[in-house]
């Protein structure tokens, strides 16, 4: 649909009644530039402009800015109202320039203060303004011709800016009612005409101007909708520079303009040709020139002397101009500019400098860091443009290194998985139409976006951020859970994957956990599995809204995560045992700074671990998942412990492990009596044989001898032998 906004047509209605000839009472020094006055000469008295002159100058400044920035498709029609309406130009492009308007205003001349005020009225101009808005412009006619049968789609909107001296608020309401009734009548006429267009939207801007020093009889009022077609706003402004400032603000509002102040412009002084001073020049342009670096938060705004909400201006610093016009800059946009104070010396110097083929680079002022060149001023075909330069990476530059991202090193990224991800989500031509469940046509591009969204709901980029995507056992589940719908076979495969993970946890299989950037051995095995289950649950929950079968997969996962109490007890004991082993290893490594523990404490710890192992074995035996152990003979414990030499220094890891093995073996059988009572590994045989007189003798009647105790493998036969009362060895 072709729409012409309110900015396409602007009608100025300026009051030419006798009271507009009154002075604005803002004095201007006439000969203030004369530096060397001859003594005895009386200076010229200051002058003041009339309300008419202030209104014409302000409206011409409005038109100048608009023509500078929008030379096409933004049209102005000028009407002077006194005893009748005088239309000074038309909507044709040939009449849209300041020279035509100023020549027409010169023929009108200033208002006659001696004319009859009763014969003059601003209503004549407002009625003529509505009539002018109904006329078709060249651009509207071209659009209607192109659309042909859809010509009614071309919109007709406009804006009326009326500068007058109202008597009161009731007078303002009367003017608004007049415009509303006139629009209603002319829309009826335009409906039956091929050369007129109905007004769809009209903005009425009433500006009440009065001399400086007087009280205003009209109050300001923001924009208000009077009807579906007409909106109105009222501004009460003092004449002189205040009126010029108000219209400067309005032109920014009406055409979406923004302000940029160029600072530190070096210019040579007239009085001192060898020195230079820095000046500032304020420029107006379309606000899109600030969009890019306003989003990045790099803008530095400063307040100017203007009033109203548009007093903010973006400050840019002058850089050394580049004289090489062949050098290319990566430019993202170019916008026409218009100086705010076009007649000032700094503005004139800057304009001439640019029109002579020079370019100026502009940088953002920063307190620290390197400078950022964000804009450039240059002329093309006699018109000056503000170019927006890209301060970020250019598509012409090399892409950023992957090491600058969140992963750091290149090897930290899941590059292989990402290649597979791109292969699964590549775009291909799709010619055959497909339909959704609700019988609506499925757009291939939207379907591709939807699939990409599903695949990226949970997709870690770095290897160290994931566990399940590093496990081959999880591939069957991770590959199908992203589907829009699952089959029964898919659900079965997901359940098998979950059961395999449960079996891995029961067997205490290691997981592929990355230890990059961590010290020590990393998290415990129990903690690794807890992280794995949490991540798997996150992946499944991200897709449970796809279908009901996705919910079944989640239910299976949650059911397998809930472990029986005996399993939790076994894991708890295992964690305690690992903690004690870690402490023992740490004590062995730090033997240079710590003393060895007493022998009794070490033996006590070994015995406690042995008891816990036995208790854990009983728990495993009672577990329904554990196999039945083979039948063994009951073990007999002894209350005696083998004599161990007391350590005289730090205890090594080998000593701790040997003591633990020896202690565990000593609990599994009854020690041979000879070894228990041996002295220096020598056992005396037949200790209980005595003569009748109490002397000890051997088997041959001679003195008893000591037989060295041989270190031989223990066997059930040897271990179960003992002496009897009559001195003969018996086997049990």
Curated annotation (Swiss-Prot):
One of its GO terms (biological process) is RNA polymerase II transcription initiation surveillance. One of its GO terms (molecular function) is DNA-binding transcription factor binding. Residues 564-650 are annotated as: Disordered. Residues 649-694 are annotated as: Cleavage module binding motif (CMBM). The modification Phosphoserine is found at residues 623, 626, 678. The keyword Cell division applies. A motif (Nuclear localization signal (NLS)) lies at residues 572-582. GO terms for cellular component: cytoplasm; INTAC complex; integrator complex; nuclear body; nucleus. It comes from the Eukaryota. It is found in: Nucleus; Cytoplasm. There is a cross-link at residue 611 (Glycyl lysine isopeptide (Lys-Gly) (interchain with G-Cter in SUMO2)). Pfam families: Mat89Bb. Residues 564-648 have a biased composition (Basic and acidic residues). The keyword Zinc does not apply. InterPro entries: Cell_cycle_regulator_Mat89Bb (IPR019355). Its main location: nucleus. Keywords: Cell cycle, Cell division, Cytoplasm, Isopeptide bond, Mitosis, Nucleus, Phosphoprotein, Ubl conjugation. The cleavage module binding motif (CMBM) mediates recruitment of transcription factors. Belongs to the Integrator subunit 13 family. Component of the Integrator complex, composed of core subunits INTS1, INTS2, INTS3, INTS4, INTS5, INTS6, INTS7, INTS8, INTS9/RC74, INTS10, INTS11/CPSF3L, INTS12, INTS13, INTS14 and INTS15. The core complex associates with protein phosphatase 2A subunits PPP2CA and PPP2R1A, to form the Integrator-PP2A (INTAC) complex. INTS13 is part of the tail subcomplex, composed of INTS10, INTS13, INTS14 and INTS15. Interacts with transcription factors ZNF609 and ZNF655. Interacts with PAFAH1B1; this interaction may be required for proper recruitment of dynein complexes to the nuclear envelope at prophase. Component of the integrator complex, a multiprotein complex that terminates RNA polymerase II (Pol II) transcription in the promoter-proximal region of genes. This is Integrator complex subunit 13. It comes from Mus musculus (Mouse).
């Amino acid at each position: 649909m072709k729409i012409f906004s309110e900015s396409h047509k602007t009608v100025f209605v300026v009051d030419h009644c006798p009271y507009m000839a009154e002075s604005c009472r803002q004095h201007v020094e006439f000969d203030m530039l004369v530096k060397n006055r001859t003594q005895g000469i009386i200076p010229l008295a200051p002058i003041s402009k009339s309300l008419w002159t202030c209104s014409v100058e302000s409206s011409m400044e409005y038109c100048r800015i608009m023509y500078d920035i929008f030379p096409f498709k933004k049209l102005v029609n000028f009407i002077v109202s006194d005893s009748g309406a005088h239309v000074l130009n038309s909507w044709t492009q040939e009449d849209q320039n300041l020279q035509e308007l100023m020549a027409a205003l010169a023929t009108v001349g200033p208002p006659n203060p001696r004319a009859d005020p009763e014969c003059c009225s601003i209503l004549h101009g407002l009625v003529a303004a509505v009539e002018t808005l109904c006329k078709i412009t060249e651009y509207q006619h071209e659009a209607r011709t192109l659309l042909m049968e859809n010509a009614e789609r071309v919109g007709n909107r406009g804006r009326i800016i009326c500068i007058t001296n109202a008597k009161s608020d009731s007078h303002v309401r009367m003017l608004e009612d007049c415009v509303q009734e006139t629009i209603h009548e002319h829309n009826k006429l335009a409906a039956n005409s091929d050369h007129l267009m109905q007004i769809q939207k009209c903005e009425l801007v009433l500006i009440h101007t009065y001399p400086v020093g007087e009280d205003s009889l009209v109050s300001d009022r923001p924009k208000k909708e009077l009807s579906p077609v007409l909106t109105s706003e009222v501004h009460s402004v003092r004449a002189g520079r205040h009126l010029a400032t108000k219209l400067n603000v309005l032109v920014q509002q009406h055409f979406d303009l923004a302000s940029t102040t160029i600072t530190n412009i070096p210019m040579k002084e007239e009085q001192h040709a060898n020195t230079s001073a820095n000046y500032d020049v304020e420029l107006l342009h379309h606000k899109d020139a600030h969009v890019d670096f306003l989003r990045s938060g790099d803008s530095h705004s400063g307040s100017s002397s203007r009033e109203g909400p548009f007093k903010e201006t973006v400050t840019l610093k002058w850089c050394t101009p580049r004289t090489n016009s062949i050098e290319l800059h990566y430019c993202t946009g170019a916008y026409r500019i218009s100086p705010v104070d076009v007649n000032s010396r700094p503005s004139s110097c800057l304009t001439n400098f640019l029109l002579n083929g020079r370019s100026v680079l502009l940088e953002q002022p920063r307190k620290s860091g390197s400078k950022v060149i964000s804009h450039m001023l240059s002329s093309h075909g006699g018109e000056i443009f503000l170019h927006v330069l890209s301060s970020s990476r250019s598509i012409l530059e090399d892409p950023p290194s992957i090491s600058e991202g969140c992963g750091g090193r290149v090897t930290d990224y899941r590059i292989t998985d990402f290649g597979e991800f791109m292969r699964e989500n590549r775009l291909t031509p799709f010619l055959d139409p497909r339909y959704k469940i609700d019988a609506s046509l499925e757009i291939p591009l939207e379907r591709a976006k939807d699939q990409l969204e599903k695949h990226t709901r949970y997709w870690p980029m770095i290897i160290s951020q994931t566990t399940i995507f590093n496990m081959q056992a999880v591939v069957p589940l991770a590959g199908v859970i992203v589907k829009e719908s699952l089959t029964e076979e898919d659900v079965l495969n997901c359940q098998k994957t979950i059961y395999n993970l449960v079996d891995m946890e029961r067997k205490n299989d290691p997981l592929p956990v990355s230890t990059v950037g961590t010290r020590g051995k990393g998290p415990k095995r129990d903690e690794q599995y807890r992280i794995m289950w949490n991540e798997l649950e996150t992946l499944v929950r991200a897709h449970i809204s796809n279908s009901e079968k996705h919910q079944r997969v989640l239910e299976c996962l949650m059911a397998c995560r809930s472990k029986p109490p005996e399993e939790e007890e076994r894991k708890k004991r295992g964690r305690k045992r690992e903690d004690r082993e870690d402490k023992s290893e740490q004590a062995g490594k730090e033997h240079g700074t710590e003393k060895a523990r007493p022998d009794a404490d070490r033996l006590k710890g070994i015995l406690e671990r042995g008891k816990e192992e036995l208790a854990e074995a009983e728990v495993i035996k009672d577990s329904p998942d554990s196999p039945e152990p083979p039948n063994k003979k009951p073990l007999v414990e002894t209350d005696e412990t083998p004599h161990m030499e007391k350590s005289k220094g730090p205890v090594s890891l080998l000593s701790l492990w040997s003591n633990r093995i020896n202690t565990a073996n000593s609990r599994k059988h009854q020690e041979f009596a000879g070894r228990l009572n041996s002295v220096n590994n020598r056992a005396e045989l037949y200790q209980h044989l005595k003569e009748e007189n109490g002397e000890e003798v051997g088997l041959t009647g001679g003195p008893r001898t000591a037989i060295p105790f041989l270190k031989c493998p223990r066997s059930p036969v040897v271990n179960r032998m003992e002496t009897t009362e009559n001195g003969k060895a018996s086997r049990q």
